[in-house]
A protein has these predicted regions:
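A structural signal for short, hydrophobic/glycine-enriched beta-strand patches
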Residues: 18-156
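Hydrophobic membrane-insertion alpha-helices, especially the h-region
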Residues: 1-16
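A transmembrane-helix-recognition feature enriched in membrane-embedded lipid enzymes
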Residues: 151-171
């Protein structure tokens, strides 16, 4: 019985966190590329999108920018990257829900009608759910890969957080 439950959980984790339902690739144009805080590996794919000219704005959730994320600190200090404006924000509360709420507010305030959110692949399912609850415009959520040794911890954490979002905290 326990073995069956573990097998079902692993299968669900593979579907939700390793190979989440794809939205395709990044759109040809968006008003902003948003990088969620929490992992330095999220920044390079976002920078590649900016270099390709996908969006004129790079928005960084920067609670970790000082000591843990020096590249983000440099981008925030420069205010520009590859011709794009860099907007740095700190979500309140510091959570994916807080980031979704903050970005929805920034989108209204700054006239962003479409956004691309870059996060870790394991986080795509929950981030997409929360951003769709808070942000009303066209949305693409893309994932950056994680190292294999981080996956068990990420799966356990995301499983709990996803269950909370599905059962208890159902709004924006």
């Amino acid at each position: 019985m326990l073995g069956s439950l573990v097998l079902v959980w692993v299968a669900a984790c593979l579907v939700l966190f390793v190979w989440p339902p794809a939205e395709g690739s990044a759109p040809a144009h968006a008003d902003a590329v948003v990088v969620l805080s929490g992992n330095k590996r999220r920044l390079p794919p976002a920078l590649a999108l900016i270099r390709r000219g996908v969006a004129p704005v790079l928005a960084l959730s920067t609670v970790q920018r000082t000591r843990h994320w020096p590249q983000a600190a440099r981008l925030c200090a420069a205010h520009r990257y590859a011709g794009a404006r860099v907007v740095c924000f700190t979500a309140v509360p510091f959570s994916t829900r807080g980031e979704a709420r903050t970005v929805a507010g920034l989108a209204l305030e700054r006239g962003w009608r479409s956004i691309v959110v870059v996060t870790s692949t394991f986080h795509v399912t929950r981030a997409r759910m929360l951003f769709k609850r808070c942000y009303r415009g066209p949305l693409t959520v893309l994932g950056s890969s994680s190292t294999w040794w981080e996956l068990p911890k990420e799966w356990a954490s995301e499983t709990g957080k996803l269950l909370v979002q599905l059962s208890v905290e159902r709004g924006c």
